[in-house]
């Protein structure tokens, strides 16, 4: 029996990719708490300049990731997903190391852009697992995998803040690079993939990729859904601490309260994603998606009327539980409507839409709060999610009618 004929232990691959997503999520969020402080340390002074550069170095990573994702997705479909995981982990480790050595803001900005260009560990992990797991377990597997990145993103800021306080800002980048290198080693030694490389001539072109989809309109609507999910999440991020301060009044531990309220949706998503993914395997991911979107709307509206931080925390916890089902449901529907041959590109296109949402969401939230007030952000976000629920329901209904 040749190595390519040996059955893949997809459960082991799921465990290792979960750990890889956890380490990647932690590595990315480790540096987030002090990003503006590092920008200041690199010589940027003045309130407006500091705000502008902090926004630029944050958003440029997502922007370049959105541009690069389709290219890496195509390469994954040609060369395999494991090699893309290795490329991403090692590339990001090297860039993080260089970030700790940056001498001025321009070097740091270029390195943040390079981080976006070389990223893509999580979408490639999703594509790898989606092509190996039995179809009837896709929802559970992708829901479980999503908790890896969420867990890392939750613990990262806490660990990053503690490390920065004890060792300074630059050493945190070196520690982050080490974490990403561990991710590279885990992937190299423990992930297995049976993949026959495809020549460039045999690769499907974009038009052929679209033609091979079972329902191209539905897949496009799922990409839009991913974008809107990230817009809805990101729109609240810039104003959350200020909104909590408005609700709490003059208290000494505002940073702790804000941090707790910021993290509760992630905790809820961590608990709900595998369970709702399993439920989606039983009743259908499309039902989970629509119900979760409607619940999100019903939770966002009262957030604009809360009177205390704890009311906001409770609503955000419930919102996180609903949101935990959204991206895994989208990814499961993408698996159902595409073939393994194009999985890398489909998941990379989805990642591009996600990155665009990560850039536009905070901009939308900041613009609305500047023009109106903090409470208006929740109402407008609820409207955007409601549009998404109607749009998604209509796309799924058309698919059902076409099948019938």
Swiss-Prot record:
Q: Does this entry carry the keyword Transport?
A: yes
Its membrane topology: Multi-pass membrane protein
Which UniProt keywords are listed? Cell inner membrane, Cell membrane, Membrane, Transmembrane, Transmembrane helix, Transport
Pfam families, alphabetized = MFS_1 (PF07690), Sugar_tr (PF00083)
Query: Carries keyword Ribonucleoprotein?
Result: no
Indicate the transmembrane segments per the record.
19-39, 56-76, 90-110, 113-133, 144-164, 171-191, 222-242, 254-274, 288-308, 317-337, 376-396
**What family does the Swiss-Prot or TrEMBL record give for this protein?**
Belongs to the major facilitator superfamily. DHA1 family. MdtG (TC 2.A.1.2.20) subfamily.
The identity of this protein, by name, is Multidrug resistance protein MdtG
Name of encoding gene:
mdtG
